[in-house]
UniProtKB/Swiss-Prot annotation:
One of its GO terms (cellular component) is plasma membrane. It comes from the Bacteria. This is ATP synthase gamma chain. It comes from Methylobacillus flagellatus (strain ATCC 51484 / DSM 6875 / VKM B-1610 / KT). Produces ATP from ADP in the presence of a proton gradient across the membrane. The gamma chain is believed to be important in regulating ATPase activity and the flow of protons through the CF(0) complex.
């Protein structure tokens, strides 16, 4: 059995670790609430631009934007992988990367090559390590991701789609369900599904008649790009909320485990102390008997 001094040292070490994990839990909880608020504030804009884009597309049915045209043959596929820049968030990044790799293998089995864009340092590092075809990446988004930082890497993938380098674009991220539950998902971004546009177009009754300046097609082109940027930005904000939730849960579990370890070490310490006292008493009694 370890000595009392050694056990006291272990208890102090675990207590210090628990203080750190408890502080990280509280910080993550605060950041999670802010991330949820950003998600809530972004929804009205995303919904409005989706509705306007759908209305314009249906009002100008003779013009088909490349983003809504399905290609007969799908060769290369684009995949945007959203991960975190930091760790200590449970299995969040592991789940996203596992899902991405499995999907890439499935596409490979169908004869499709995957071109990847990485958002977040953890995903970028891993994808480079497995020699994935990473066409663009962005890291260092911080706790408050801004669309301006994402536009560059989004544009690379959109240009690749327009140029025919990829025939589909998907995004893999962690969807925020609630504080205790997050889910890694893959969603198709391009081509835009008819269901999304049809649903948005039918939400408003009557005919929408727009006056365009300078030209209807130019307006639609610009709105389509903004709409795709909004979809990807929304996925990033959901991933951020999921990251902070997962980190809060992970740090709470670590704090609880540390508390249990401290309790067990204190029991061991008390037993060691009791054994030492019993030994001393036995020696004293034995010495007295000898006299």
């Amino acid at each position: 059995m370890a000595g009392s001094k050694e056990i006291r040292s272990k208890i102090k070490s675990v207590e210090n670790t628990r203080k750190i994990t408890k502080a990280m839990e509280m910080v993550a909880a605060s950041k999670m609430r802010k991330a949820q608020e950003r998600m809530r504030m972004a929804r009205p804009y995303a919904e409005k631009i989706r509705n306007v884009t759908a209305h314009l597309s249906h009002a100008n049915s003779e013009y088909k934007h490349p983003f809504v045209v399905k290609r007969e043959k799908v060769g290369n596929v684009g995949l945007i992988v959203v991960s975190s820049d930091k760790g200590l968030c449970g299995g969040l990044n592991t789940n996203v990367l596992r899902l991405s790799i499995n999907q890439m293998k499935a596409w490979e089995g169908e004869g499709k090559k995957t071109i990847v864009s990485a958002i977040g340092n953890k995903g970028f590092t891993y994808l480079n390590r497995i020699n994935a075809d990473v066409k663009s990446h962005v890291t260092g988004l911080g706790d408050t991701p801004h669309l301006e930082k994402l536009i560059g890497t989004i544009k690379v993938m959109l240009d690749a789609y327009i140029a025919g380098e990829i025939d589909q674009l998907h995004i893999c991220y962690t969807r925020f369900l609630n504080t205790m539950k997050q889910e890694a998902v893959i969603e198709q971004v391009l081509p835009l599904s008819d269901d999304k546009l049809e649903t948005s177009a039918t939400t408003a009754k009557g005919h929408w008649d727009y006056i365009y300046e300078p030209d209807a097609n130019v307006v639609i082109d610009e709105l389509m790009t903004r709409y795709i940027e909004t979809i990807i930005y929304h996925a990033v904000t959901e991933n951020m909320a999921s990251e902070q939730s997962a980190r809060m849960v992970a740090m709470k579990a670590a704090s609880d485990n540390a508390k249990n370890v401290i309790g067990e070490l204190k029991l061991v310490y008390n037993k060691a102390r009791q054994a030492a006292i019993t030994k001393e008493i036995s020696e004293i009694v034995g010495g007295a008997a000898a006299v």
